[in-house]
Amino acid sequence: MDGPLAGSVGTISGPPDFALLHDIAMPQKDQLCGAFWGALILSAYGRATGQEEVALMAGTVLAEGDPVGWLPPGATPRADYEVTMPVAANDTSAGTSAKGVARSIEDLSGGTLGVVPVAGPWSANSVLSLVEISAATAPGCVLVANLRTGHLWGSRPPARLLLDHLLGRTVSPPAPDWDCGHFLTIAGCVGGPGGALIILRDTYPQLGWDGYHLQPAAAVAAALDRGDGREGGVLCTCEAPEAGALAGRLGDAAFVLRHWDNGSPDGESGDHNG
């Protein structure tokens, strides 16, 4: 798998009106990035759901402290929770597990949606392969990536850097905007003669261009790999009848299909996934 053809753009459409609903829903509520996507996916499939309902089902536990320290530059806190959320006794017991997010999506959908968890292995080529297989097998799917943002490029690089990367030229990566565990979605990829960029859809309009940013496939792979003793991965969410076929294609491509440990096992302890 050598990546997309030069000049090609591959997109994952997601469910109907997903991009519009995303634009309306931003920004996420504080510390509910995983629940943000769960609620958005469920709502797009006709099951109107709030971030809090998904978070409670996922076992999310909030960390105490000043939320400004967990936000990307320019973002402001949003703590308008509709219910009382559980708060951890200490930072090490706060967070949201990817398994919890998957469970909440499947259970709250009444079994109409399925989640295929992909735990790696991660490389630039495998990220591109995941996008292409998902788009071909389940074009209405949503790829929810759980990663470490500190390995990504800054979300608003000069256009020349993106073009140089696509041409295969060596560039100096812009510093990341922030560094934390996070959930976002993969919306597609762009291919050039010397490289590829992944289209990411984020939870804050301050990141990139109204929440969208382009990242080298290798940077996304590093962010999924994390390098901090925790694991990352992608929750491939689609209609339940498509999940089996998607899992089969991904398994044939040597992906590891299992849930991963991001440091927050079912919200009981671990990493703060913003």
Range-by-range predicted roles:
Residues D2-C141, R230-E231, C238-G267:
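Cysteine-nucleophile protease catalytic domains, especially the papain-like/related folds used
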Residues L40, T149-L152, P205-Q206:
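Solvent-exposed loop/turn segments at secondary-structure junctions
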Residues A44, G154-R156, W209-G211:
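Generic domain-boundary/flexible-linker signal
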Residues G46, Q51, P158, I199-D202, ...:
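A generic "cationic amphipathic patch" detector
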Residues V68-G69, L162, Q215-A219:
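Short, charged/polar low-complexity linear motifs in solvent-exposed/disordered segments
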Residues A124-R201:
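Active-site-adjacent substructure of cysteine-protease-like catalytic cores
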Residues L167-G181, G188-G274:
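Noncatalytic regulatory segments and standalone regulatory/sensor domains
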